[in-house]
Each structure stands twice: as C-alpha cells, then as structure tokens.
Amino acid sequence: MNKIEVMDWYQIKKHLYYTHDDFVRDIIALHLKKGALTDIYNYICKTSLFSIEDRFKGLAESIEDNICSEIITLFLDKRPIIRWYLNSTEQLEMDIDARFVDSLDIHNKICDFFTGLSCLIDDNIFLLDNIIKEKPLVLMIFNPQTSPQIIEDTLSLQQAT
C-alpha cells in the first residue's frame, strides 16, 4: 500500500477517478456506533469544505430516528461532489461523483474530509470501485489518525474488513 503523497495527480486520477466504466466511487464504513449519524451530520455542518441544501439544515436532532432513504448532497463550490445515503444507522453509505474531481486540490479536500470523518467515527472508511459488484475492490482506505492510503494491489472489501 502506498501513501497518498507517492502519486502525482495524473496517477491519482487514473487510479481512483477514472470514468470509463462509471462516474461514481462508493464510500462505505461498517459498524457505526449508536449516535454516529448525528455526529456525522454535525461534522458535515461544521466543516468549511462542503455545504448542504438548506432543507437539510437542522436535521441533527432527528436523523437517527428518521432513516428514510433520504439522500443529502454535499457541495464543493456549488458542485455536487458527495451524496450521503441515509439508509441505515449501522453503516455509512456515500458516493463521490468522479466527474467533478478534476484537480489535486479537490482530491485533497475529499481526503481531508474522509480522514476527519474516520477519526470522528473511529473506524476505517473505504473508497470502492463499485459496491454493487459481487466483490467490490477497495481503491483507498481512510484510517483514523493516519494518512489515507491508495491501494495499488487488488484488495476486496471482504479482505480489508
């Protein structure tokens, strides 16, 4: 596994954000603790990296109780970069729209966001090629208290967890 600093933007884009098969890269964290969704929501609202639609502001008090298959879009400079799927209180489900990750700066902001989020939930967060596949491949791991890691070898989600 290589740390993120080893690759230049061209290599990162080619490895993580290629769009010849799909425009979406899936994000998942398993085994969320009780109250984690509220913590994640508050983290999103407090970060200066992303903004959310006004209709989702003030949701913190009821987010754990009202899992309703809602989708919250996170915007970076008015571009819909990340979608958060409120399907479960037990795992984090998000995706990144790879079409809008067009610079190293945006990639680094995404890494900062997910590194901070992994510290908050005290669990690994995985960036996957396609969660729908039978054996999705892990492209990147965000670990609490460490730098993100790009996975250059083949690593399935089952192997990583």
Language-model region placement:
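Short, intrinsically disordered low-complexity segments
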Residues: 49-104
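Ampiphathic alpha-helical segments that act as solvent-exposed interaction surfaces
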Residues: 29-48, 99-127
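Short, surface-exposed coil-to-beta transition loops
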Residues: 24-25, 77-81, 135-137
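Long, contiguous binding/interaction regions
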Residues: 2-8, 16, 90-104, 123, ...
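Short Gly/Ser/Thr- and Asp/Glu-enriched loop/turn motifs at secondary-structure junctions
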Residues: 23, 89, 131-132
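Short, extreme N-terminal segment that most often corresponds to the first beta-strand
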Residues: 1-53
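A structural detector for beta-sheet-dominated domains
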Residues: 7, 31-33, 85-87, 95-99, ...
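Acidic, proline/glycine-rich low-complexity IDRs
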Residues: 1-5, 107, 111-161
